[in-house]
């Protein structure tokens, strides 16, 4: 599956100018969806400034560039979801893919989902909010709504992925530690032609009953395959408030 030549080589020599996720106005998607060329200068310059803050993040960014399937394991705040979504946005706006598909399990909803007010979209919104937040921070809420209306961005719970084949897409599976082995296997087989998939999660923070999460086992089985990247981030890669890393070591 390794297919793209790395554009990082020269940039790695100087992290202060490391800008791998911005190619303004290139490719058909940039025209079809308005591209970044139509965005205000403030937003375009902000998009250009995504940079790795650690060796682990640097390895993840390189893997996202080179592999069709990447599994990113790491604690909260290590940047795995944000970097995956940043790569997805770049792939869409540069024309490498035609759409972004973001999915995560709605574990907390469970059987109580039916008691929540509103239509299904309203019921699921709180559980998909972290994905909206990452997109909004990346390209702005107005742009996110526009791309979702056009069908260029889809955010859905994992249950909605069954039976689909996702071609020409960048797929991010977030919070995969809350998926069973069977669910992750099902999701991996959704990968279609000309697509990239990223699976992110922290095996140490699952909300499932002990032994039910399949993320750790899936990562172990996939790691020997050279066509697939398995990146393991650690507390050293956390870029949230310094207290987060400290708390994770004792809680």
PLM features: what roles do these ranges have?
Residues 96-98, 150-153, 167-170, 184, ...:
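Loop/turn-to-beta-strand initiation segments
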Residues 77, 159, 177-178, 204:
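Catalytic acidic motif of RecA-like/P-loop NTPases
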Residues 106, 110-117, 170, 179, ...:
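Conserved P-loop NTPase nucleotide-binding/switch module
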Residues 147-164:
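Conserved helicase/translocase P-loop NTPase motor core
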Residues 218-251:
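Conserved coupling/interface region of RecA-like P-loop/ASCE motor cores
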Residues 50-67:
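Pre-Walker A adenine-sensing motif
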Residues 1-39:
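Interdomain "pre-motor" coupling segment immediately N-terminal to P-loop NTPase/helicase cores
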Residues 71-78, 82-152, 209-224:
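Conserved P-loop
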